Amino acid sequence: MSKAMEKRRAARKLALQALYQWRVAGASISQIEAEFAVDNDLQQVDRDLFKAVLYGVPSSVSELDALLQPFVDRKLTDVDPVELSLIRMGAFELRSRIEVPYRVVINEAVELAKQFGGTDGHKFVNSVLDKLAPQLRQAEVAAAKSKKK
């Protein structure tokens, strides 16, 4: 894994922790960012990605939830906080960071779910984002599927 990939993975991990704190503790995003800057070595993190996700998810949470809800079999408020943060992060990246391949977005979210989510949380995260990807990345998903044939 390249150094840049490691930094992006670390950024997603920190963003997940920050978004969890935002959801559970209700702290402000700027306060969370300041705490994370003090408590973590941000030299080892893709700071642009961290900030994009940290600020992008809360500022567009209503839109992200509207995109996600059709693919979730219960109210989003009933989803585990870690898994909800992960599918929101994934939806944000699928929608807003088109330079990142959709498979990478899904895989990174699944790996974080395996590390931090419930027993089958990774399956839930994979299922939701896999269904959402064709809606947000229609041409990219279609091209990937046609290569498989």
Curated annotation (Swiss-Prot):
<dbReference type="GO" id="GO:0005829">
    <property type="term" value="C:cytosol"/>
</dbReference>
<dbReference type="GO" id="GO:0006353">
    <property type="term" value="P:DNA-templated transcription termination"/>
</dbReference>
<keyword id="KW-0889">Transcription antitermination</keyword>
<comment type="similarity">
    <text>Belongs to the NusB family.</text>
</comment>
<keyword id="KW-0804">Transcription</keyword>
<keyword id="KW-0805">Transcription regulation</keyword>
<dbReference type="GO" id="GO:0031564">
    <property type="term" value="P:transcription antitermination"/>
</dbReference>
<dbReference type="Pfam" id="PF01029">
    <property type="entry name" value="NusB"/>
</dbReference>
<dbReference type="GO" id="GO:0003723">
    <property type="term" value="F:RNA binding"/>
</dbReference>
<protein>
    <recommendedName>
        <fullName>Transcription antitermination protein NusB</fullName>
    </recommendedName>
</protein>
<dbReference type="InterPro" id="IPR035926">
    <property type="entry name" value="NusB-like_sf"/>
</dbReference>
<dbReference type="InterPro" id="IPR011605">
    <property type="entry name" value="NusB_fam"/>
</dbReference>
<dbReference type="InterPro" id="IPR006027">
    <property type="entry name" value="NusB_RsmB_TIM44"/>
</dbReference>
<comment type="function">
    <text>Involved in transcription antitermination. Required for transcription of ribosomal RNA (rRNA) genes. Binds specifically to the boxA antiterminator sequence of the ribosomal RNA (rrn) operons.</text>
</comment>
<keyword id="KW-0694">RNA-binding</keyword>
